[in-house]
Amino acid sequence: MTTSKPRKPSKAKAAKAAKAAKAALEKISKPLSKTPPPFRNHIIDKKALKNLVAWSFKHHGTAVTSSMADDLKDLGFKYATQAAVSISVDDLKVPAAKKDLLGQAEEQITATEERYRLGEITEVERHTKVIDTWTETNERLVDAVKKNFDENAPLNSVWMMANSGARGNMSQVRQLVGMRGLMANPQGEIIDLPIRTNFREGLTVTEYVISSYGARKGLVDTALRTADSGYLTRRLVDVAQDVIVREDDCGTMRHIVVEAEDSKFAKRLVGRLTAAQVVSAEGEVLAERDTEIDPALSSKIEKAGITAVSIRSPLTCEANRSVCRKCYGWALAHNELVDLGEAVGIIAAQSIGEPGTQLTMRTFHTGGVSTAESGVVRSKVAGDVEFGSKARVRPYRTPHGVEAQQAEVDFTLTIKPSGKGRPQKIDITLGSLLFVDNGQAIESDVTVVQIAAGAVQKSVEKATKDVICDLAGQVHYEDKIQPREVTDRQGNITLKAQRLGRMWVLAGDVYNLPPNALPVVDGKSTVTEGQVLAEASQRSEFGGDVRLRDSIGDSREVQIVTTAMTLKDFKLLEESNHSGELWNLEAKDGTRYRLNTIPGSKIGNGEVIAELADDRFRTGTGGLVKFAPGLAIKKARSAKNGYEVNKGGTLLWVPQETHEINKDISLLMITDGQWIEAGTEVVKDIFSQTAGVVTVTQKNDILREIIVRGGDLRLISDNKALERFEGDGQMVNPGDDVAKGVSVDTMKFVQTVETPEGKGLLLRPVEEYTIPNEAQLPELSHLKQANGPHLGIKATQRLAFKDNELIKSVEGVELLKTQLLLETFDTTPQMTVDVERAPDKRAKTISRLRLVILESILVRRDTMSDSSHGSTHTDLQVEDGISVKAGDVVATTQILCKQEGVVQLPEATEAEPVRRLIVERPEDTTTISTSGKPSVAVGDRVVDGDLLASGQPSDCCGEVEAVDGSSVTLRLGRPYMVSPDSLLHVRDGDLVQRGDGLALLVFERQKTGDIVQGLPRIEELLEARRPRDSAILCRKPGTVEIKQGEDDDSLSVNVIESDDAIGEYPILLGRNVMVNDGQQVTAGELLTDGPINPHELLECFFEDFRSRKPLMDAAQEAIANLQHRLVTEVQNVYKSQGVSIDDKHIEVIVRQMTSKVRVEDAGDTTLLPGELIELRQVEDTNQAMAITGGAPSEFTPVLLGITKASLNTDSFISAASFQETTRVLTEAAIEGKSDWLRGLKENVIIGRLIPAGTGFSGFEEELQKEAGPHPDILSEDPAGYRRMQNLRPDYTVDMPPAASSSALLADPSDADLEATRTRHNIDPSASTNAAFTRPDVDNELKEEQVVDAEAVEGLQEEGLLSDD
């Protein structure tokens, strides 16, 4: 510290000071010199760095840590600069072991393929084995990569970065220098062709394409993920936003138990408070109730071997609508007990929502089950295997197709050595797989058993895979498949295999026969190349004239004209105008018909061919249609084509002009009711066509329509007459009186109108149109065939409008149309009529319209291309222009044999004619000569390696066709293994082509983590979705009894409960039972596999506890069990993706989901049945009932998903701002709800301070407690919140340090007092003024002090003293 003018000290003083300083320095540095800082010579990687920073933060606080982190950063950069770690292609060193590893994998896979080819394993087993082999190889390769770098290049830059955790990870290094590995296709199934190369060696084209599948998937995933994750966070924030720490201690005795995983608690206890004493096995008390558990205490508890600790948790906190400090524990931001007013709900929501982006969306289905060689025990000695007397085993086939035995009970297996030595004992657990038989002699180091890990029954799903045929031929089953017919609910018959067995396809050349082809050769006959095997013919159905069209592509069209009709009375004329060509029909009398169809098009029955262009029925403007009595129309389904006239008569037409405007009213240029002349501008740029009275229709200052009605306007005062014609108006016949002195001589339509001059009658002219009974048309001929379809034309009159219809239009309309319609009889629905233009037979210049019905026959050209059809040869049997009768052959097609051989025909039945035939060619058989007498018989089927004679194995697969003394003739074939319950697509003896499906294998594969993983799984849990096909849960505890149903498929599980009642649970097909006979089960336990329905689980728990406990306790325990389940499930998803979230965050959210109950029976309370209400509220209500003696309410706990919970909060403002705004606000308004503004969201929306942090109302009590002599400074605050800035500037309130939340209010300093005195002109020397002198310790005034009235007034003005 320096002063402005240092004085020179005396020498003695200086010496003394120096000595003292030296002593002080020694005093400080002595401990340092004795204990030098620990020198640790370790590699500091990412993990060690993490721990170092955490330790520093805990012991030395933020400032020291941040400066240390800075120093570390500088250090790192300094050495990184000097080391210059770079990466180049040469750094990617592929381990030499890769070649051998891939070689081994290839060998295993070749062996598997060979087993598949010989029909020893099914397609599924082959696929599973291939994938597992590659997965294992990949893992071994990663180890080789690590070993290679570690031993040969520990300072390799790639390895250093990945190994220290600075950048990249092992899976990326694996792809750079190991192998890229297996990829999934877009459906999520793994492709069994792995990418063997790495990026260093480069990918082949095929590998590149497969590789880009995965990359695309990743990109799409990321895009979807961000959106989903954001929405999840929003819902979480909404459900938890009002959870604020409002109390210090709720005093609850309830708690949750945290159990150690593998005798470790990791971080699960840190930051929690104990709910009871923690006592070690020796009886030593490690912690009292309400002790904060820090890492040291946590590891102490672990070391003491304690496996379960009771801690306080937000789940069991009894604070009303909030959480208390002790139940919440540490705020993880600064590792100290959470402060009052901390918005822990929002923190929880963000903590769970934020890692959402790191979770994957969808997972891959691995083909089959990834059976890592887990728990495999090998023999240590050579000897004989003994199972022992207790052993029970059943045959089992592993997913890789290895025959083994599965243990049904726990027992001990012994291997008795053949020589000296101790026997090897292996403990076999239920469900383990044994690869040896009882009494079998084995060598040492042989796989004996695979021990089942934990629960055997995993969640599995049914999946299917097709077996595709590799060669054409004939199918034969082995007897042991035992196919049986199964009829499903729809009545479809399918064939199912009952046992494991082979299906053989014996080779041959299979010919597909076209429809209607018949074989012309007999079975077992020998055919030569080019011989006709079958013949098909195409026939005409109706007969007629043949037209041959030019061929298109590989087929020719033969058209047979069945019926034709030419309209002789009409000329066909063509006109063209700007919109294209128009065709007209002109009759002899000159009337013209407009053609609706152009020549070359097709039309169907009942369609309009032409319309009469008739101006007699055209009006000048729009108007009103009235039918005179006698005119009748047919009812039409739609008015699109108008209404057909039944009976002629008179049609009356009242013209009026209607302008549809839809413009602003300011453009109107006339007034309503005014009489205007033709040509008047009614609206800007719109002119009236006729004269008459104007009616203006408007709505909301928008002009809709302007109607001009012409006629004779008479202003009269006869009220009776005016009333008579009010509204729609009436028709008046000639000679009738309309009003006094007004009569009409022609028919008029009379209406009352209001004009600016007053009321009057408008006599509107009526036009009459006479409509004939029949359409006037020239004679039209019907054309009939002796048999088959025939044609006709009929004329109809159609009115466009019905009686009393108003036509709003300025232009005129056509009232009546005369149409020519096509009529066809005896046609099939597919038949259409072609419209053609034909020259007249006599005068070539005149064209006529011709209607034709054609039968079209497509004739295939000769094809060589389609191998399965053999070569076909087609002959046309007709020529152009000749006439054929119905049933005549038009073309024949022959199927020719491609290669000599022996024909075999399958059995033909009435229902199923022969569709295929097979020719057994010379190359489909092989003859093997044997040295001795063959040991096989005709009809035996052999595979590679089977003995044909002693010491002579077969080198191919097939069926023995002939045997003589020294040779065996085999018909080549291929076996396919079929697993039980597979669907067989073909029957014994069927012929198949290469590529046909033979069977559908049904197999079970393990569900990869419920398939749903990551975000969708989190969402499913937090929204409490009811899963499809959920598992069957046990309702009451008891003993299991498994029963077979009527047929061997169906099972039922009975649970014998404690009171000997029997709970029956029928099990659906395809469900796996997860319990064993005689097993004890508890409520809520799974009886079958499948996802759990959380709502059902809660019901099971509640029913079970309700039978033994009071309602309140039952509800709390049921909820507690479910809460524990939910927290664990959510944690599991995040853990599986490597994200760590503290339990307490999830607990806060789950607490909000389980806080409500549904009232079932209100009792004497004011609650409503069906109402959702907080458990605490019901508890209070029921306690009040217990005191007054009323009937308490009955309720059941409910689980709400986060969306539902958000919409069911007490605050309607918060709910409405979340979703379904209108519904929430409407309901709140109807119920007259009040919002108490307890949460953060409501206050933000209203615009007040949020009740968290310093705005939290709990602060005021703290302040009041500490305000000491000046309680009034806190009194006047309109907002009801104690804001810091509201305290007067003369006083300072120190914000409490984070550790304790007690507020301190310092007394005013001398300077402050001085300032206030000066402001109020108070004489400082007058010691009697109590207001500005300091009170004594007890806030009592000394006797000599008197209160100065002026000073008090001044203080009251300042608001520093209350009026009391």
Curated annotation (Swiss-Prot):
EC number(s) reported in the record: 2.7.7.6
UniProt binding sites for Zn(2+): C250, C317, C324, C327
Reaction(s) this enzyme catalyzes, per UniProt: RNA(n) + a ribonucleoside 5'-triphosphate = RNA(n+1) + diphosphate
Membrane-crossing residue ranges in chain numbering: none
InterPro entries to which the protein is assigned, alphabetical: DNA-dir_RpoC2_beta_pp (IPR012756), DNA-dir_RpoC_beta_prime (IPR045867), RNA_pol_Rpb1_3 (IPR007066), RNA_pol_Rpb1_3_sf (IPR042102), RNA_pol_Rpb1_4 (IPR007083), RNA_pol_Rpb1_5 (IPR007081), Rpb1_funnel_sf (IPR038120)
Keyword Nucleotidyltransferase (UniProt): yes
UniProt entry keywords in alphabetical sequence: DNA-directed RNA polymerase, Metal-binding, Nucleotidyltransferase, Transcription, Transferase, Zinc
SUPFAM superfamilies reported for this sequence: beta and beta-prime subunits of DNA dependent RNA-polymerase
Entry annotated with the keyword Transferase: yes
Class of enzymatic activity (EC top level): transferase
Cofactor(s) in the UniProt record: Zn(2+)
GO molecular function terms attached to this record: DNA binding; DNA-directed RNA polymerase activity; zinc ion binding
Cofactor note: Binds 1 Zn(2+) ion per subunit.
Region (Disordered): 1318-1342
One Gene Ontology term from the biological process aspect of the record: DNA-templated transcription
Gene Ontology, cellular component aspect: DNA-directed RNA polymerase complex
Role, per record: DNA-dependent RNA polymerase catalyzes the transcription of DNA into RNA using the four ribonucleoside triphosphates as substrates.
Record-linked HAMAP family: RNApol_bact_RpoC2
Family affiliation: Belongs to the RNA polymerase beta' chain family. RpoC2 subfamily.
Subunit structure: In cyanobacteria the RNAP catalytic core is composed of 2 alpha, 1 beta, 1 beta', 1 gamma and 1 omega subunit. When a sigma factor is associated with the core the holoenzyme is formed, which can initiate transcription.
Record's protein name: DNA-directed RNA polymerase subunit beta'
